[in-house]
Amino acid sequence: MQAFHFVMALSPIIVVLVGILGFRQSAKRVAPVALVWTLVLGFTFFNRTGATFTESIAVFDGLIWKGLKEGLKIVWMVFGAFVILNLLRDTGAIEDVKATIACISDDRRVQAVVIGMLLPIFLEGAAGAGAPAAIAAPFLAALGFHPVTAIAMALLGDATPCSWGGAGLTTINGGAALVDAGVSTVSLNSAMVGRIHMFGALIIPFLIVFMAFGRKGFKRIVPYLAFTGVTTCGVMFALSNFVGAEVTSMGTGLISMLLSIGYVKLVGVNTPDEFRNHFTARERKYSAFQALSPYVFILALLPAVRYGFPALVKNGFAVMCTFGYIVWVDVVIMLCGFLGALTMKVGLKQYWSVCKKTAKHVTPVLITMSSLLIVSYIMQSPHTGMMNLIASDTAKAVARLYPAAAVAIGAGGSFITGTGLGSNIMFADMHMQAAQTLGMNPITIFAGQNAGASLGNMICPNNTVAACATVDEIGNENQVMKRTLPAFAVLLVLYMALAMLYTCVLFPNFGA
């Protein structure tokens, strides 16, 4: 009977995965079906509080409205990112973008690593909230990568920094339960998750190249990939262990980008012709700054607003989050697109035309995104207890393998909630209690949870749908997930092994 309850609690996730991957249906068709099924479960099988039908309606009504509002905020960011891509296409600046990036390196594999991994790490620290994939995927598509590949690379590249998120919030707020209980500190939480993610940073450059080009992609580029992996690994370890959670993501991305570009310029990469980014030679329509201006403004304004506004305005961060954290990111991306249009001397009529064309493409995403968010909220709700049932049953089944299970639970939490922060907040208390019962270190177990939650973002349906919308690939979510799942599996197994090793062998008394 217990197993049946577990399967029923898991069934909304099964519906989504089977619908998208098994039946190859678009998320816009699968998401409403999953929502209806989850509502049926919420009214019947998982009515844990014994609420009447009217009381259940009142609970779900609030969750539905919350899903619609949060979905609209995400679609707004998708709209802003897609406007920039369409603006580059419409003006012809996209060719000048390719020519400019080629001045750094015309090797498409180098471009994939820098834009697909290092840029998302920086953007995660500067803003978070889905901005890395929403910005990096269109950028990669603009460079000529297949849109599905571009999305998959951007999601994979953002697999490690989500544990810190914008200004360290995912670790700071997500691990607050351990800090409040006096069993850990923010510094210890950041240090231990950094010791897990450093190995992810080490191998992700190789995974990105394999994802985009297959085995042949490693031809004559292994030294560069090894250098980028080792330096990113080292920088991430140093910042997370000796500086702080607030700057780990942004600092790792920025320093690693500079080191990577420095290697290309000083050492060089012997690029086979098949991996060169060929573009049509023509007279430039825009200067390098003009063509890249929307992205230059994003790189400058996201961290400037995130760190500058709270420093200059009393309760500035609270003001920024008045309508939710993601809204300020939406506004900045929209502003950067508009400033980019002005820099490229695009007329208001043309800019408005691009906006209208983009709106037609992204509006249907609202139904998909809202449906998935509502499913997530219902599963998290105390009214149903579905998410807690999944996590607690998993924990009971694994016993001494709990550190490894914590990684999987963290990934499952972010797969459902769409955020590492949500996953951490949801399960931190449970992990602390389990660690006490099993006589294990709660810091290393929570680090596994935090690292797993970061990984879950790369296969989360919400993030996949949003990223697909930024490059006009709505309906091809199954193709993206087929690309990201193998890389996710590799990293998940690695992190589970590290969680066991750290908890049981290397750091059983860490923080004591």
Regions found by a protein language model. Give the residues of each.
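Hydrophobic alpha-helical transmembrane segments of multi-pass integral membrane proteins
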Residues: 107-138, 142, 366-382, 397-430
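Short helix-coil transition sites and intra-membrane helix breaks within transmembrane domains
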Residues: 72-74, 85-95, 122-134, 160-168, ...
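Alpha-helical transmembrane segments of multi-pass membrane proteins
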Residues: 109-121, 147-163, 184-205, 400-415, ...
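Hydrophobic mid-bilayer segments of alpha-helices in multi-pass membrane transport proteins
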Residues: 8-18, 25-50, 75-81, 225, ...
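Re-entrant/interfacial helical elements at transmembrane boundaries that shape
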Residues: 131-141, 154-155, 168-180, 208-211, ...
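Membrane-interfacial loop-to-helix junctions in multi-pass transporters
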Residues: 69-74, 101-115, 143-149, 326-329, ...
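Core transmembrane alpha-helical segments of multi-pass membrane transporters/permeases
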Residues: 58-95, 114-121, 287-308, 321-385, ...
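Juxtamembrane and boundary regions of transmembrane helices in multi-pass small-molecule transporters
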Residues: 27, 163-277, 451-512
